[in-house]
Amino acid sequence: MADFEERRLPVGIQSFKEIRRNNYAYVDKTEIVWNLVNRGKKYNYLSRPRRFGKSLLVDTLQTYFEGRSDLFEGLKIMNLEKEWKTSPVIRLDMSRAGASEKTIRSYLSMAFSREEAKYGITMHEGASLADRFDTIIQTACQQTGESVAILIDEYDSPLQHSWKTPDHEACTAVYREVFAILKADDEYERFVFITGITKFTQISLFSVLNNLSNISFDEPFAAICGITTQEITDYFGPEVKAMGEANGWTEEETMARLKTNYDGYHFCRSNMVDVYNPFSLVNALADKDIKNYWATSGATSLLLKFVDDMEIKLTDYDHSAILSTIIETSDVTGGGAELFLYQSGYLTIKGYMNGLYLLGFPNHEVRQALYETVLPALAMRKRGDIQSAQAYLYMHMYMGNADEAKKFMKALIADVPYSNKKLASMDMEDRYRLIMSTIFNAIGFRVEVERMIATGRIDMVVTTDNYIYVIELKLAKNGGIAAAEKQIVDNRYTEPFKADKRKVIALAVELDDQGKGLVDWKEVEQS
């Protein structure tokens, strides 16, 4: 490992070659890579969420197949690979292919032209993309005397972005036409590796490759992308220390904050190892700050396209279940919201029992990103119209100024329980509970709804770095503030939190019976 002063973190860098040549910090995944290539399975598929290191993995594989042993010096693979054999590599990055038949054909034509030039191939005018791909694979093998490695990165990008548009079927037709060649040219291929986020089974990648090995749930490859706690200790100790010093945190506190915000992903059913989102983790270490990096990178852009009524159902997904037959094999277009949310990284595996996967939010960053995404739809306002009120609500709640925070909560809730017709089937108090918990989650606070304690059930517990808010809701017709205050006092709702070093603020909240909004709230004095 280089001295800390010399180290650079590979923020946004997806090139293994660039990382190794320019002395960026690198988490050594090469033993897992070697095992993947040399386990005797030719066709392999890996699903991982966006910004999880798939492209870096593909580039690492390309470098390995190119026989560039010089770039692997000092890494684990050097103890495993005895013969650095060079193989021809065909690499396609489908994230560059747009979302229409025209753009996909244009990208593939450009990529194939590059390969044809490399091998001196001249095709007749009007040759189909499938014929060109077929000729490239066979010629590369014949000219080099070595079987071909084919790497297809982000295969599903055009299919995701064209989903629910008139272009989608034409896009899938191109895939069926071109990638059927992979099976036909089996004898010329050494290794085929496909990455993606979501699974579209109606295309030929999955229908014709009968022996396609889906390693997405395999325990040996659970940490092939992402970063584990042990890897943070092994590779980023100086950065963790520097981050703590910059913020006045101990190393233990720094690790706890990183874990809460970016850890929690699991990709297998047994012996689950915690995996951090690498994009967010490396950015946080580089900035010496805790921010929501994943959402700002565009990770939530397709969410509302695949999940209907997300704003109403979101709380249900945090403790959901899905059959193993669905999560492991089904098409994203027919597998339900939970399948899309899992494949896209919004949910992760929390447990497994009797053919059933238990799912939940992986970490605080994802939870906040989801609630922030759905809040405008729930509040029936544009994001820009509510951002100011959100910011002021956050500031005053964070500072413990509940009285000032009240006016901004009023502004955010105003008329929503009455006007949002999607809430019509819900009890009025449940509507308020959903809206308020969504708002608190969206601004980054930790929220427990209907928290059970020995003396009763608290409507909501909201925690910040310095305060714990114990909140009881009552409609005006049910006694409003007076009834809420009495329940807090009689049931000693603040008692379980007194050992916490944070200050406890109890709020008795009165809500309009007809759904017109927050009437008032009051801090309850505690004995």
Q: What positions do the PLM features span?
A:
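Active-site metal-binding core of divalent-cation-utilizing nuclease and nuclease-like domains
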Residues: A140-T144, I439-D465
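Domain-level recognition of nuclease-like catalytic cores that cleave nucleotide substrates
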Residues: P496, D500-S527
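Phosphate-binding site recognition
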Residues: M1-M428, I443
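Metal-dependent nuclease catalytic cores in nucleic-acid-processing enzymes
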Residues: V178-D185, L339-L347, S437-A442, Q487-L507
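Mg2+/Mn2+-dependent nuclease catalytic core
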Residues: E169-Y175, L475-T494
